[in-house]
Amino acid sequence: MALWGGRFQGETSALFKLFNDSLPVDYRLFEQDVVGSIAWADAIASVGIITATECSDLKKALNDLLVEVNGDPAIILASGAEDIHSFVESALIAKVGDLGKKLHTGRSRNDQVATDLKLWCQSEGAALLARLHSLHAELLALAEREFDAVMPGYTHLQRAQPVTFGHWCLAYVEMYERDISRLADALTRANTCPLGSGALAGTAYKMDRHALAAALNFASPTLNSLDSVSDRDHVVELCSTASISMMHLSRMAEDLIFFNSGEANFISLSDEVTSGSSLMPQKKNPDALELIRGKTGRVYGSLVGILTTMKALPLAYNKDMQEDKEGLFDVVDSWAICLDMAALVLSGLKVNRPNALLAAQQGYANSTELADYLVSKGMPFREAHHVVGEVVVAAIAKQIPLEEFSLAELKTFAAIIEDDVYPNLTIEACLAKRDVLGGTALPQIQQAIAAKKAR
């Protein structure tokens, strides 16, 4: 049953129906549409459009429909309805007859779908927050377990300075905490109820929209009917928040893919999250991490899609906005499974401490310590930086680490170098000197973990 047939005399093209119908996508809003309709029944009863008995009958029929569809979800798509609103209204009329035709009084599909979508975002957003918290907890547990495992830190993907695996974990803990905060903020801004805004100018019936918002567990009603039905900021913001979080997931995945490679071999991944090759028997591929990295692109694509759809739309509602859901649903699905998969990867991850330590001891990662040593002896840092660069060139030529130079050899570069230089060049010294808030010294890492666990 079309909800708009009276104006038209000709038949709708089958091709147009296929092109126009959104039920294959918006069927996911079924529960929200029923919940919103129940609240709307109470609202129109409060202004005398329907009687208390009629309101009760409508609400019972809607609740019965909810039970029926939850028992057999295929009912929706088999209906051939134009959209989820048409399906619910047609099913309601089939149950209660002409009474069902009264429910849409004062309501438009414009404020109806805006409400459904915000309800869906609130529900799915809460589930995503729970997933982010689970990933955060898993990463924090890994940081605590491997807080003192030494590994090289990188800039430009070249060994730079030694850090610990716990320090690396805490870097991503910080990122996911920002993701949690960002999502919570987005959900707060989306916590307003458009219902009662009508098609664009507001409903003609003087109902209490504050009560209507409260009935649907929104913090407040929206304040401008034009904005209410035109706004998809909450969709954009959820896609944007997901994109930033997926960027963090993708970067973490890339780090772990490298750490797991034969060239690094700092970590091993569990069999649960890896697969093999159809040809090469020795392969153990980090497919879970590669898919996280790959799915990031499709999330970005959906963000660009909704921004492009909305960028030139005049107020108020336009059919273009029907395209808001498919990308959003895919974003939420992709983000959710990537969060779950990342947590599973971390839960089975093992650090290969000897290999990671050996890599940290190579590549002249203690060069900065030698420069700092020269500074402690009175040499300006820029001069010390140049001197140590010359030492590194000589060490590369001799294929030895800095600490294997004799004192006499080191003095040819700077006469102020004494025997006390050698304790400064150990990995332990490199780490211990970074005993500042946010640094990689072991006490700082332990304090950071304890502070985050105490929250």
Swiss-Prot record:
The keyword Coiled coil does not apply. Its EC number is 4.3.2.1. Disulfide bonds: none annotated. GO terms for biological process: arginine biosynthetic process via ornithine; L-arginine biosynthetic process. Keywords: Amino-acid biosynthesis, Arginine biosynthesis, Cytoplasm, Lyase. Its main location: cytoplasm. NCBIfam families: argH, PRK12308.1. This is Argininosuccinate lyase. The lineage of its organism: Bacteria, Pseudomonadati, Pseudomonadota, Gammaproteobacteria, Alteromonadales.
